[in-house]
């Protein structure tokens, strides 16, 4: 019975808390506005004071408001155009050197492949020994059952090898 009173008391307390919450009004909660200094706001929004911009082409440390390649061309000044043309010319020369080195490497590789194919091609003129004939020769002890040499009468040698292979094993 006491458990019933505890559960009833807790339920009543929770009900009172839930019913009391809507009575709180927005006036009771005070929200303070932050004071913003106009000088600080101007400093934050000033386009000249942006953070440095980093990318793969220009690197880091240059501000976005600094002169870029586009503004150099717009200035129509002779030194800026000369600087830009020198930079483009050096990049073109570097690209050409890279391409020439690539062509040279491919040419050398092709020559090596041709030399290797010529070396292997020259060795293909002579007949290769048959490994089965050598194996059979070692296996059989008596000279009559040996297979003939690979360079003599090839069709007869292969037929004899086939006969030896198909013979039943006897001990």
From Swiss-Prot:
Signal peptide span: 1-26
Keywords: Amidation, Cleavage on pair of basic residues, Disulfide bond, Hormone, Neuropeptide, Secreted, Signal
UniProt xrefs under Pfam families: CCAP
Subcellular location: Secreted
Residues excised as propeptide: 27-49, 64-171
Cellular component annotations (GO), alphabetically ordered: extracellular region
Keyword Signal: yes
SS bonds (residue pairs): 54-60
GO molecular function, one term: hormone activity
GO biological process: neuropeptide signaling pathway
Major subcellular location class: secreted
Tissue: Central nervous system; most neurons exhibit coexpression with burs.
Organism domain of life: Eukaryota
Region Disordered, residue ranges: 116-171
InterPro entries, per the entry: CCAP (IPR024276)
Keyword set includes Flavoprotein: no
Modified residues (Cysteine amide): 60
Function: Cardioregulatory neurohormone that increases heart beat rate during adult wing inflation; has no effect on beat amplitude. The effect of CCAP is both ino- and chronotropic.
Protein name in the entry: Cardioactive peptide
Organism encoding this protein: Periplaneta americana (American cockroach)
Lineage, top ranks: Eukaryota, Metazoa, Ecdysozoa, Arthropoda, Hexapoda
